[in-house]
Amino acid sequence: MKGSVLILAAHPDDEVLGRGGTIAKLAHQGLAVHVAFLADGVSSRSGDPTAQQDDLISRRMAAQKACDILGVKSVYFGDFPDNRMDTIALLDIIKPIETLVTKFQADTVFTHHAGDMNIDHRRIHEAVSVACRPQRGHPVKKLLCFEVPSSTEWQLSGAAPTFAPNWFVDISDTLDRKLAAVEAYAAELRPWPHPRSRRGVEHLARWRGAIVGFDDAEAFMLGRQLA
């Protein structure tokens, strides 16, 4: 990879769960990695405005800490409603994504898989697909989709496209940083056995590595590559 990398995620912690080791690896290689969270990640949890604001501040602080651990160059926080992005017109989601792509002149974009259970994930995938159309002069040359434990694999069989990875990144040297970033989101972790537990995240990295001959890996689906 070369140039600028942009991760377009729904919620803080999606970036770590889906590709934290890859972020750390690319940052270590000297690439500018930018992370954008489009939804607030908390507003669906409580009807109390004060509690919502406190949760929002805590979640964003955790996100900044995690991104600092991974070596992210910049972090953007959007304010689309959590778990309600299906109530937003698609064009209104596309526009800020296009602005971010143009701002960072992103050569590579990572985003959610089309078949995730979470509605915000699916909506962002749809918007990114439109925003990154391969028009003449468009900066994005590679579009990859990541998995998110407790969303991607929980979709019902046959209900949506299946995540079938065809692009793997060796994160054997950066798994420790991924797990440290996961710990920054302590409030979002679940006890084992749960795919979004620390142990679950580590197990997934081991499994994704084992199926391609690495100690640890992250798996992606290549949506498009222009060479």
Q: Where do the language-model regions lie?
A:
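Metal-dependent de-N-acetylase/amidase catalytic core
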Residues: M1-L8, K25, Q29, T50-D54, ...
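Short, glycine-rich nucleotide/cofactor-binding loops
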Residues: I7-V16
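Cofactor-binding loop segments of dinucleotide-utilizing enzymes, especially the Rossmann-like FAD-
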Residues: A10, L38-D40, V148
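Histidine-anchored nucleotide/phosphate-binding helix
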Residues: G18-G41
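Short, surface-exposed acidic-centric catalytic microdomains
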Residues: V33, A39-K73
